[in-house]
């Protein structure tokens, strides 16, 4: 096998509650991504996005990686890894520094982002991303790219995302147990946004709802920047459990019934359509109308979308997203999900699938690959920025090496006092 060359190949690893997806992307001569390898395997060892069994998780990752390597014809050495879970926290913050040479340079941007992320967080959390929203130079607001601009004071408005220290450490441990290095850990809804949202939607205002197996992840964008993120601990696994309980069928059959026959809006399901439902033990299978199945599924989707709507209202952005809602993730594929969401949100809703990728497009243009493709696109952006510097995941990049914490603190004090 050929070795994966840094700068030519990018790997995304989506370690989800229901499945592990490994994607290998090759950077083409024109700077585009071509997906050349895909590996998927049922996830064992995670619950609601958090590792609960190291050995089972390692085995699932290894099998997905092996499959992707075989398809791509290369050996994988490192990957961009997604993270999700109810332990994710976020807040908006800002920082202010003096501009040393009256012209903003990369060091000034690094210092102001460091200042902005200097917020009090619990000891068991760590900063995952510091995502720049916009900058203020003196009294000039709305600056998106401050580099090279003149002024005496630089302010950054940022969205800070934190995660549980042990959750991220366990994910890294599992990946390294498979012989891989971790290029970066990325919030999964941020990755999905890279692959399914258009620039126009992010400018106008949009809410991404990524419905996975264990959690539903929310990201709100306005004026081209991320403004709010949240996690709701209800997703596809709850739908499967509802079917298993209501139909008294084993979980593996409930999952198959959900994927093949379920509908999120009962009025769209044909009353005359029937399905066979396997029973528990040696009991014979039973027949059930598809509409009766939909009546089991619809209340859970209704609850989920109502919780998303409540989060939108709590965030204060409900009236600031004229581009509406974009649903993605494996659980968003169900028939009737978009129609039910439109009834609840009273705004435009569409199904988001990855775009702007080449290669195995017939396969990856599917909501279940949104996070995986987004991880590739995130990696492509970092590679084009030199892969040399990331302020806890911010979009800012520099060719300068990252200084030690004490040295950065010393520079910050010198620059401000």
UniProtKB/Swiss-Prot annotation:
Q: Where is the secretion signal located?
A: none
Q: Chief subcellular site? A: membrane
Q: Which UniProt keywords apply?
A: Cell cycle, Cell division, Cell inner membrane, Cell membrane, Membrane
Instruction: Give me the segments passing through the membrane.
Output: none
- What membrane topology is annotated for this entry? Peripheral membrane protein
- GO biological process terms held by the UniProt record: cell division; FtsZ-dependent cytokinesis
Please give the Pfam families that the UniProt record associates with this protein.
FtsA, SHS2_FTSA
Q: What does this protein do?
A: Cell division protein that is involved in the assembly of the Z ring. May serve as a membrane anchor for the Z ring.
Q: Which PANTHER family does this entry report, sorted A to Z? A: CELL DIVISION PROTEIN FTSA, CELL DIVISION PROTEIN FTSA-RELATED
Q: Name the family the entry cites.
A: Belongs to the FtsA/MreB family.
Subunit structure, interactors included: Self-interacts. Interacts with FtsZ.
Q: What is this protein called?
A: Cell division protein FtsA
Q: Which organism does this sequence originate in? A: Pseudomonas aeruginosa (strain ATCC 15692 / DSM 22644 / CIP 104116 / JCM 14847 / LMG 12228 / 1C / PRS 101 / PAO1)
């Amino acid at each position: 096998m050929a070795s994966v060359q840094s700068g030519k190949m990018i790997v995304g690893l989506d370690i989800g509650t229901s499945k592990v997806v490994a994607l290998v992307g090759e950077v083409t001569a024109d700077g585009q991504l071509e997906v050349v390898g895909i590996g998927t395997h049922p996830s064992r060892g995670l619950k609601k996005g958090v590792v609960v069994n190291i050995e089972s998780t390692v085995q699932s990752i290894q099998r997905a990686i092996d499959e992707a390597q075989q398809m791509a014809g290369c050996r994988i050495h490192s990957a961009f890894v997604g993270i999700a879970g109810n332990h994710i926290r976020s807040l908006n913050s800002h920082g202010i520094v003096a501009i040393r040479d009256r012209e903003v340079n990369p060091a000034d941007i690094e210092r102001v982002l460091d200042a902005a992320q200097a917020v009090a967080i619990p000891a068991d959390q760590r900063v995952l991303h510091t995502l720049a929203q916009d900058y203020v130079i003196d009294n000039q607001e709305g600056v998106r790219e401050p580099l090279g601009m003149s002024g005496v004071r630089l302010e950054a408005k940022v969205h800070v995302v934190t995660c549980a220290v042990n959750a991220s450490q366990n994910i890294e441990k599992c990946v390294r147990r498979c012989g891989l290095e971790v290029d970066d850990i990325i919030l999964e809804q941020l990755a999905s946004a890279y692959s399914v949202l258009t620039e126009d939607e992010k400018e106008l205002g949009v809410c991404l709802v990524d419905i996975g197996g264990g959690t539903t992840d929310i990201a709100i964008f306005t004026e081209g920047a991320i403004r709010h993120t949240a996690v709701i601990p209800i997703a596809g696994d709850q739908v499967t459990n509802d079917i298993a309980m209501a139909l008294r069928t084993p979980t593996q059959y409930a999952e198959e019934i959900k994927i093949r026959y379920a509908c999120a809006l009962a009025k769209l399901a044909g009353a005359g359509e029937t399905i066979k439902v396997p029973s528990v033990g040696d009991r014979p299978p039973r027949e059930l109308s598809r509409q009766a199945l939909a009546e089991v599924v619809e209340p859970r989707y209704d609850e989920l979308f109502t919780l998303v709507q409540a989060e939108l209202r709590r965030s204060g952005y409900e009236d600031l997203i004229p581009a509406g809602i974009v649903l993605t993730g494996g659980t968003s594929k169900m028939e009737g999900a978009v129609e039910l969401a439109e009834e609840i949100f009273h705004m435009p809703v569409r199904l988001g699938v990855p775009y702007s990728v080449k290669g195995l497009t017939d396969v990856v243009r599917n909501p279940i690959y949104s996070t995986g493709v987004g991880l590739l696109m995130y990696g492509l952006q970092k590679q084009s920025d030199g892969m040399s510097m990331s302020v806890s995941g911010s979009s800012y990049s520099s060719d300068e090496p990252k200084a030690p914490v004490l040295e950065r603190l010393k520079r910050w004090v010198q620059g401000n006092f």
